[in-house]
Amino acid sequence: MPAALLLAGYLAIACAGESALHQAVEKGERKLVEQLLTSGADITVRTESGETVLHYAAFPKDAWFATRLIAAGADPCALNNAGESPLFWSALEGNVAVARTLLRQRADANARDAKGNLALHAAAHNGEAAMVRLLLPQTKEPNARNREGLTPRDYAAASGHTAVVKLLEGAHQ
């Protein structure tokens, strides 16, 4: 029944402006995502805080969602109201598979959010070592300071992520 209602458009927009497509992607519902896209779901719809469905592809640990959404026309460089890209969200979630997909589609690892943070700041803060390893070669300024004057290494150190600190120390040279 939920799929039929979603496809019929009865639940097109839910709380916080999430579309049925946002919800299906977030929950990792491949079949429903495919049905919604095939039925003409709006790939450009945003939540009240500006997230596209591609931002939500950071949640399921499956790059299929990002690949499929980009093939349907989703913008890998789209920013939400806080200036965060889908790559930034993938870094926060530690979703390396999605981040790799986004980078292949020209997502910008050097884009900064409204606070001046790179995706590398987000990955370092959360101790996502695999993500840091992926982002380091893509980041022009791995020691970039955000508006508070903090580097990704500062975030990793403050959060007690020693393995990430060691990775980032090599970037100081």
Identify the meaning behind each predicted range:
Residues C15-T52, Y56:
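N-terminal segments that cap or nucleate solenoid repeat domains
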Residues P142-Q173:
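Leucine-rich solenoid repeat scaffolds
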Residues Q23-G28, Y56-D62, W89-N95, A122-E128, ...:
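Ankyrin repeat A-helix N-terminal signature
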Residues P2-A12:
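Bacterial N-terminal signal peptides
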Residues K31-L32, W64-F65, A97-V98, A130-M131, ...:
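Conserved ankyrin/ankyrin-like repeat signature
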Residues E34-D42, T67-D75, R100-D108, R133-E141, ...:
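Ankyrin repeat domain, specifically the short helix-to-loop turn at the C-terminus of the second helix
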